[in-house]
Protein backbone atom coordinates (compact mmCIF):
# COMPACT_ATOMS: atom_id res chain seq x y z
CA UNK A 1 0.00 0.00 0.00
CA UNK A 2 1.35 3.40 -0.97
CA UNK A 3 2.33 5.71 1.85
CA UNK A 4 1.47 9.34 2.31
CA UNK A 5 2.24 11.88 -0.41
CA UNK A 6 4.30 15.01 0.25
CA UNK A 7 5.01 17.82 -2.18
CA UNK A 8 8.54 17.63 -3.64
CA UNK A 9 11.05 20.29 -2.67
CA UNK A 10 13.02 22.17 -5.30
CA UNK A 11 16.65 21.24 -5.99
CA UNK A 12 17.80 24.62 -4.75
CA UNK A 13 20.38 25.12 -1.95
CA UNK A 14 18.58 28.27 -0.77
CA UNK A 15 15.34 26.32 -0.23
CA UNK A 16 17.22 23.41 1.31
CA UNK A 17 19.16 25.55 3.75
CA UNK A 18 16.05 27.45 4.80
CA UNK A 19 14.20 24.17 5.35
CA UNK A 20 17.00 22.82 7.55
CA UNK A 21 17.19 26.13 9.43
CA UNK A 22 13.47 25.87 10.22
CA UNK A 23 14.11 22.35 11.53
CA UNK A 24 16.72 23.74 13.92
CA UNK A 25 20.02 23.08 12.13
CA UNK A 26 22.72 25.66 12.90
CA UNK A 27 24.03 27.19 9.65
CA UNK A 28 27.67 26.22 10.24
CA UNK A 29 27.15 23.78 7.36
CA UNK A 30 25.30 24.83 4.19
CA UNK A 31 24.29 23.17 0.95
CA UNK A 32 25.90 24.64 -2.18
CA UNK A 33 25.50 23.89 -5.88
CA UNK A 34 27.90 21.52 -7.60
CA UNK A 35 28.15 23.25 -10.97
CA UNK A 36 30.05 20.48 -12.72
CA UNK A 37 32.22 17.41 -12.30
CA UNK A 38 35.45 19.01 -13.59
CA UNK A 39 38.25 19.67 -11.09
CA UNK A 40 38.21 23.45 -11.63
CA UNK A 41 34.49 23.59 -10.78
CA UNK A 42 34.95 21.32 -7.77
CA UNK A 43 37.73 23.59 -6.51
CA UNK A 44 35.29 26.45 -5.86
CA UNK A 45 33.21 24.36 -3.44
CA UNK A 46 34.02 25.26 0.20
CA UNK A 47 35.76 22.46 2.08
CA UNK A 48 35.36 20.27 3.94
CA UNK A 49 32.34 18.55 2.38
CA UNK A 50 30.49 16.02 4.55
CA UNK A 51 27.68 14.88 2.20
CA UNK A 52 26.41 15.20 -1.36
CA UNK A 53 22.85 14.81 -2.61
CA UNK A 54 22.56 13.58 -6.20
CA UNK A 55 19.43 14.19 -8.26
CA UNK A 56 18.89 11.80 -11.16
CA UNK A 57 16.07 10.55 -13.41
CA UNK A 58 14.39 7.21 -12.82
CA UNK A 59 14.69 5.56 -16.25
CA UNK A 60 14.36 2.02 -17.59
CA UNK A 61 18.16 1.76 -17.78
CA UNK A 62 18.47 2.77 -14.14
CA UNK A 63 15.79 0.31 -13.02
CA UNK A 64 17.58 -2.54 -14.82
CA UNK A 65 20.85 -1.58 -13.13
CA UNK A 66 19.19 -1.21 -9.72
CA UNK A 67 17.70 -4.71 -9.93
CA UNK A 68 21.01 -6.25 -11.03
CA UNK A 69 22.92 -4.40 -8.29
CA UNK A 70 20.50 -5.58 -5.60
CA UNK A 71 20.69 -9.21 -6.75
CA UNK A 72 24.50 -9.09 -6.87
CA UNK A 73 24.80 -7.68 -3.34
CA UNK A 74 22.29 -10.19 -1.98
CA UNK A 75 24.30 -13.06 -3.45
CA UNK A 76 27.82 -11.77 -2.73
CA UNK A 77 27.20 -9.67 0.38
CA UNK A 78 28.82 -6.38 1.41
CA UNK A 79 30.21 -4.77 4.54
CA UNK A 80 28.00 -2.07 6.09
CA UNK A 81 28.95 -0.52 9.41
CA UNK A 82 26.24 -0.41 12.07
CA UNK A 83 27.05 3.30 12.46
CA UNK A 84 25.16 4.14 9.25
CA UNK A 85 21.77 5.80 9.88
CA UNK A 86 19.49 4.49 7.13
CA UNK A 87 15.75 4.79 6.60
CA UNK A 88 13.34 3.47 4.02
CA UNK A 89 11.14 5.72 1.89
CA UNK A 90 7.40 5.19 2.12
CA UNK A 91 6.33 8.79 1.45
CA UNK A 92 5.67 9.39 -2.25
CA UNK A 93 7.47 12.40 -3.78
CA UNK A 94 9.63 12.76 -0.64
CA UNK A 95 12.74 12.35 -2.77
CA UNK A 96 11.32 13.92 -5.93
CA UNK A 97 13.28 17.00 -7.01
CA UNK A 98 14.91 17.01 -3.60
CA UNK A 99 13.99 14.84 -0.71
CA UNK A 100 13.51 15.26 2.98
CA UNK A 101 14.76 11.68 3.37
CA UNK A 102 17.98 12.53 1.55
CA UNK A 103 18.47 15.50 3.85
CA UNK A 104 17.83 13.37 6.92
CA UNK A 105 20.39 10.84 5.68
CA UNK A 106 22.94 13.62 5.14
CA UNK A 107 22.47 15.18 8.58
CA UNK A 108 21.97 11.98 10.59
CA UNK A 109 25.30 10.59 9.40
CA UNK A 110 27.15 13.79 10.29
CA UNK A 111 25.85 14.49 13.79
CA UNK A 112 29.47 14.75 14.98
CA UNK A 113 29.97 17.76 12.68
CA UNK A 114 26.69 19.69 12.50
CA UNK A 115 25.23 21.74 15.34
CA UNK A 116 21.58 21.98 16.32
CA UNK A 117 19.73 24.93 17.79
CA UNK A 118 17.96 24.52 21.12
CA UNK A 119 14.65 22.70 20.63
CA UNK A 120 15.56 21.49 17.13
CA UNK A 121 12.78 19.43 15.53
CA UNK A 122 15.30 17.49 13.44
CA UNK A 123 17.52 16.69 16.41
CA UNK A 124 14.47 15.44 18.32
CA UNK A 125 13.44 13.21 15.42
CA UNK A 126 16.94 11.74 15.09
CA UNK A 127 17.21 11.07 18.82
CA UNK A 128 13.80 9.43 18.94
CA UNK A 129 14.45 7.24 15.89
CA UNK A 130 18.08 6.25 16.54
CA UNK A 131 17.22 2.74 17.78
CA UNK A 132 14.49 2.10 15.20
CA UNK A 133 14.77 -0.10 12.12
CA UNK A 134 14.88 1.57 8.66
CA UNK A 135 11.21 0.62 8.17
CA UNK A 136 10.19 1.96 11.58
CA UNK A 137 11.96 5.27 10.88
CA UNK A 138 10.02 5.60 7.63
CA UNK A 139 6.70 5.04 9.36
CA UNK A 140 7.65 7.44 12.14
CA UNK A 141 8.46 10.18 9.62
CA UNK A 142 5.11 9.68 7.87
CA UNK A 143 3.32 10.78 11.02
CA UNK A 144 5.84 13.39 12.21
CA UNK A 145 3.74 16.52 11.70
CA UNK A 146 6.44 19.00 12.76
CA UNK A 147 8.64 17.94 9.83
CA UNK A 148 5.75 17.48 7.37
CA UNK A 149 4.37 21.00 7.93
CA UNK A 150 7.84 22.54 7.53
CA UNK A 151 8.37 20.47 4.39
CA UNK A 152 5.13 21.68 2.79
CA UNK A 153 5.93 25.30 3.63
CA UNK A 154 9.37 24.98 2.03
CA UNK A 155 7.92 23.25 -1.06
CA UNK A 156 6.07 26.48 -1.88
CA UNK A 157 9.14 28.71 -1.40
CA UNK A 158 11.12 27.57 -4.45
CA UNK A 159 11.77 29.58 -7.59
CA UNK A 160 9.50 27.29 -9.61
CA UNK A 161 5.86 26.53 -8.91
CA UNK A 162 5.36 23.45 -6.75
CA UNK A 163 3.67 20.61 -8.66
CA UNK A 164 0.41 19.03 -7.61
CA UNK A 165 0.74 16.63 -4.70
CA UNK A 166 -0.68 13.92 -7.03
CA UNK A 167 1.72 14.67 -9.90
CA UNK A 168 4.14 11.83 -10.61
CA UNK A 169 7.79 12.87 -10.19
CA UNK A 170 10.35 10.75 -12.05
CA UNK A 171 13.37 12.39 -10.42
CA UNK A 172 14.97 11.00 -7.30
CA UNK A 173 17.53 12.15 -4.74
CA UNK A 174 20.07 9.99 -2.91
CA UNK A 175 22.57 10.92 -0.23
CA UNK A 176 26.27 10.05 -0.45
CA UNK A 177 28.05 10.17 2.90
CA UNK A 178 31.26 9.15 4.65
CA UNK A 179 30.81 6.81 7.62
CA UNK A 180 33.66 4.95 9.34
CA UNK A 181 36.07 5.32 6.42
CA UNK A 182 33.67 4.23 3.67
CA UNK A 183 31.46 5.99 1.14
CA UNK A 184 27.81 4.99 1.38
CA UNK A 185 24.94 5.59 -1.01
CA UNK A 186 21.71 5.99 0.96
CA UNK A 187 18.54 5.53 -1.05
CA UNK A 188 15.29 4.85 0.79
CA UNK A 189 13.93 2.99 -2.23
CA UNK A 190 16.70 0.39 -1.91
CA UNK A 191 16.65 -2.36 0.72
CA UNK A 192 20.01 -1.40 2.21
CA UNK A 193 22.87 1.13 2.02
CA UNK A 194 25.37 0.65 -0.84
CA UNK A 195 29.05 0.59 0.13
CA UNK A 196 31.09 2.29 -2.62
CA UNK A 197 34.47 1.68 -1.03
CA UNK A 198 36.95 3.60 1.05
CA UNK A 199 36.91 7.38 1.46
CA UNK A 200 37.98 10.09 3.90
CA UNK A 201 36.91 13.57 4.96
CA UNK A 202 39.58 14.98 2.65
CA UNK A 203 38.68 12.95 -0.46
CA UNK A 204 34.92 12.58 -0.02
CA UNK A 205 33.88 15.04 -2.74
CA UNK A 206 36.19 13.55 -5.36
CA UNK A 207 35.12 10.01 -4.43
CA UNK A 208 31.45 11.00 -4.63
CA UNK A 209 31.98 12.52 -8.07
CA UNK A 210 33.28 9.16 -9.32
CA UNK A 211 29.99 7.57 -8.23
CA UNK A 212 27.97 10.41 -9.79
CA UNK A 213 29.78 9.96 -13.11
CA UNK A 214 28.76 6.28 -13.15
CA UNK A 215 25.11 7.32 -12.81
CA UNK A 216 25.54 9.69 -15.76
CA UNK A 217 27.40 7.13 -17.88
CA UNK A 218 24.54 4.65 -17.48
CA UNK A 219 22.14 7.19 -19.03
CA UNK A 220 24.27 9.17 -21.51
CA UNK A 221 21.24 10.67 -23.26
CA UNK A 222 19.85 12.13 -20.02
CA UNK A 223 20.61 15.68 -18.91
CA UNK A 224 18.53 15.75 -15.73
CA UNK A 225 21.34 15.33 -13.24
CA UNK A 226 22.11 17.75 -10.44
CA UNK A 227 24.09 17.68 -7.20
CA UNK A 228 24.37 19.80 -4.08
CA UNK A 229 27.09 19.47 -1.46
CA UNK A 230 26.87 20.01 2.29
CA UNK A 231 29.98 22.03 3.05
CA UNK A 232 31.42 24.06 5.89
CA UNK A 233 30.05 27.61 5.87
UniProtKB/Swiss-Prot annotation:
Reaction catalyzed: Thiol-dependent hydrolysis of ester, thioester, amide, peptide and isopeptide bonds formed by the C-terminal Gly of ubiquitin (a 76-residue protein attached to proteins as an intracellular targeting signal)
Record site: Transition state stabilizer: 89
Alphabetized CDD domains for the sequence: Peptidase_C12_UCH_L1_L3
Gene Ontology terms for molecular function: cysteine-type deubiquitinase activity
Span of domain UCH catalytic: 5-232
Cellular component GO terms, alphabetical: cytoplasm
Active site: 95, 172
Region (Interaction with ubiquitin): 8-13, 222-227
Function according to Swiss-Prot or TrEMBL: Ubiquitin-protein hydrolase is involved both in the processing of ubiquitin precursors and of ubiquitinated proteins. This enzyme is a thiol protease that recognizes and hydrolyzes a peptide bond at the C-terminal glycine of ubiquitin.
Family label: Belongs to the peptidase C12 family.
Cited PANTHER family: UBIQUITIN CARBOXYL-TERMINAL HYDROLASE (PTHR10589), UBIQUITIN CARBOXYL-TERMINAL HYDROLASE ISOZYME L3 (PTHR10589:SF24)
Protein name (Swiss-Prot/TrEMBL): Ubiquitin carboxyl-terminal hydrolase isozyme L4
UniProt organism field: Mus musculus
Protein's gene: Uchl4
Amino acid sequence: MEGQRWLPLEANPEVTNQFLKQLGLHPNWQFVDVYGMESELLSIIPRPVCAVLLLFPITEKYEVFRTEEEEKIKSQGQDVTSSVYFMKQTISNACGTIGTIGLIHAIANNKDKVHFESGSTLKKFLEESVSMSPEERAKYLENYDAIRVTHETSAHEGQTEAPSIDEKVDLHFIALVHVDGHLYELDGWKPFPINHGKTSDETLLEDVIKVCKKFMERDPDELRFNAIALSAA
